[in-house]
Amino acid sequence: MALDLEKLKFGTELIKRGFSSMTKGGVIMDVTTAEQAKIAEKAGAVAVMALERVPADIRAAGGVARMADPKKIREILDAVTIPVMAKVRIGHISEAYTLEKLGVDMLDESEVLTPADPFFHLYKKKLTVPVVSGARNLPEAVRRIFEGAAMVRTKGEAGTGNIIEAVRHIRKVNEEIAIVRRMTQDEIKTAAENIASSYFQLRNEASTDLFGQSGKVLYDDVYYGMSREKIVKGISDILRQIRKLNRLPVVNFAAGGVATPADGALMMELGADGVFVGSGIFKSPDPEKMAKSIVEAVENYKDYDVVARVSEGLQGMPGIDIESIPRDSRLQERGW
């Protein structure tokens, strides 16, 4: 039977997840100029992430961080042949559609930018372009997959050059997957109800505003036309997929604090499918050498002779101790 290409259109879950899987085992690099994008491509990056400023500069500047200038994104798109991704603010529907129209290959609904919606992330199934989202734990990852994320990544603590939070997040996801493997059907439903609860925050607040604490709350249309029951069922289905696969049903990359070849190798050793590098390359003294070295270390993460060789003579970006950052100033705290 001939394949009906008309039915296999860009934008289906199959295509979006398939595109994301093509980046497995590789390194995706943050770039702010066309020249940096060329350096990343030459170094062997599987994709680049176009943004206005790298996370370290966003952290230092403070204020409100938004999507990059479309002109800059077009310049980067024209400069390289590898896929180009772009960051969008959490929940910013209009930024997402604008970036999709520009022709980027993938979006990152990113906590590095200032969130736009205090209640909801993007409903990514409405976009034709695949979306990656950050997660500190399995409940966050499951919510993003339920919304249509084609890829998940650790949040880490972007712009610090400190790998500890990325390690924390991937270890938590791995541990929680191990727990899901042993869950009964009743336990899966209970977990799904707990994971789904963040979708009801707006309805709960609105009902309290109108009726006070004693008012009855209806959960018939709480997120893009979906009822509480439909959301819980969708999340239960994802948990059952995880139990069957013993992993997330989408690729899971490491991000947030990768600053050396050994950092990249460590995240692969812990089970990441690939690595995002933000500030770690272009905030290092020798970006070209650092870019090539991280790519080689990630591709050969079990060969420590290679990791040692590519690390020689390298100096990473200045780092920040996580404990010196107030909790409410940590980028990883953004998102729900």
Swiss-Prot record:
UniProtKB keywords: Lyase, Pyridoxal phosphate, Schiff base
Subunit-level organization: In the presence of PdxT, forms a dodecamer of heterodimers.
Record carries keyword Phosphoprotein: no
Binding-site residues, D-glyceraldehyde 3-phosphate: 171
Enzyme Commission code(s) on record: 4.3.3.6
Organism: Thermoplasma volcanium (strain ATCC 51530 / DSM 4299 / JCM 9571 / NBRC 15438 / GSS1)
InterPro entries given in the database record: Aldolase_TIM, PdxS/SNZ, PdxS/SNZ_N, RibuloseP-bd_barrel, Thiazole_synthase_ThiG
Reactions the enzyme catalyzes: aldehydo-D-ribose 5-phosphate + D-glyceraldehyde 3-phosphate + L-glutamine = pyridoxal 5'-phosphate + L-glutamate + phosphate + 3 H2O + H(+)
Enzyme class (EC, first level): lyase
Positions contributing to D-ribose 5-phosphate binding: 30, 159, 257, 278-279
Single annotated GO MF: pyridoxal 5'-phosphate synthase (glutamine hydrolysing) activity
PANTHER family noted in UniProt: PYRIDOXAL 5'-PHOSPHATE SYNTHASE SUBUNIT SNZ1-RELATED
UniProt-listed SUPFAM superfamilies: Ribulose-phoshate binding barrel (SSF51366)
PROSITE patterns: PDXS_SNZ_1 (PS01235), PDXS_SNZ_2 (PS51129)
Pathway: Cofactor biosynthesis; pyridoxal 5'-phosphate biosynthesis
BP term (GO), one: pyridoxine biosynthetic process
Family note: Belongs to the PdxS/SNZ family.
Pfam families recorded: SOR_SNZ, ThiG
Protein name: Pyridoxal 5'-phosphate synthase subunit PdxS
Function of the protein: Catalyzes the formation of pyridoxal 5'-phosphate from ribose 5-phosphate (RBP), glyceraldehyde 3-phosphate (G3P) and ammonia. The ammonia is provided by the PdxT subunit. Can also use ribulose 5-phosphate and dihydroxyacetone phosphate as substrates, resulting from enzyme-catalyzed isomerization of RBP and G3P, respectively.
Residue positions of the active site: 87
